[in-house]
Curated annotation (Swiss-Prot):
GO cellular component assignments: cytoplasm; Holliday junction resolvase complex
GO biological process assignments: DNA recombination; DNA repair
SMART domains the UniProt entry points to: AAA
Domain remarks in the Swiss-Prot or TrEMBL record: Has 3 domains, the large (RuvB-L) and small ATPase (RuvB-S) domains and the C-terminal head (RuvB-H) domain. The head domain binds DNA, while the ATPase domains jointly bind ATP, ADP or are empty depending on the state of the subunit in the translocation cycle. During a single DNA translocation step the structure of each domain remains the same, but their relative positions change.
Spans annotated as Large ATPase domain (RuvB-L): 4-184
Name of the featured protein: Holliday junction branch migration complex subunit RuvB
Family, similarity comment: Belongs to the RuvB family.
Keyword terms of this UniProt record: ATP-binding, Cytoplasm, DNA damage, DNA recombination, DNA repair, DNA-binding, Hydrolase, Nucleotide-binding
Catalysed reactions listed for this entry: ATP + H2O = ADP + phosphate + H(+)
Compartments (UniProt record): Cytoplasm
Broad class of where this protein is predominantly found: cytoplasm
Binding site for Mg(2+): 69
Signal peptide: none
Amino acid sequence: MIEADRLIQPQLQGQDDVIDRAMRPKLLDEYTGQDDTRAQLKVFIQAAKNREEALDHMLIYGPPGLGKTTLAMIVANEMGVNIKSTSGPVLEKAGDLAALLTNLEAGDVLFIDEIHRLSPVVEEILYPAMEDYQLDIMIGEGPAARSIKLDLPPFTLVGATTRAGALTSPLRARFGIPLRLEFYNVKDLSTIVTRSAQVMGLAIDSEGATEIAKRSRGTPRIANRLLRRVRDYAEVKHDGAVTKKVAEHALDLLDVDGEGFDYMDRKLLLAIIDKFMGGPVGLDNLAAAIGEERETIEDVLEPFLIQQGFIQRTPRGRIATTRAYLHFGMIKPE
């Protein structure tokens, strides 16, 4: 199974959550990247405020580490309301969700991370709450049990998921605002790195920020994590300032190459190239070849490699592209 402390993994690790929180933008105007999403949100939020209504329910989906939680916080700030946060696996019983819903005030945001992992029982309770702002509660047990309806104040449910396809159709259909987050480009990531460095009181030049951004796999969470490790290197081995050369040396030492790949990415690509002659290779065979679970390959390793054009996913299996061969100084056979 893939190591939990893999430096360039997009999932939270260590002190990420605490540190990310300190670096998060609070308003849309402070938020970098995702231009289409930001433009849409500005319109939806302003319209809801003009009508003095709760914002429509929102589903934010995309790979981990791109800012889904940050956007939920920004929505609450822009609307001037409170936000209550939880996650799908935490809501084990209907009563867990009912306790949250009954404590919401008008217009508040309820943020559910990993919403695709809601249990069916909890999801059933959510339907009338989302549609009619009503909560159906069973009182008593057995033949004496009866259902009562509680009115809820209008609220906004913001669901976040890395696997939108895993949501049930009835739940997905109840979100009026679906927003997909994409991997960030180097320019936007450089801006994020520079801003984070300012928050940390770290001297960094534009080339140093760009070098970190290039190796951050299009993901702000990874960029901030790499920035912290480069800072360590700069303070111990240099004068504390981050330049391109300092960033290069630090990230090379950490085994994060110019494309943002670590040994697991290279292991996956070389398995396709060397063991399966470039592919196509099925997911199960590939998982066995590198000793990983198929879900890890699909959810953690593949998305960035596909998005960057190093792997093609075809009906017959995975294929290493010409770009993958060039990365290792090889020529793809005809």
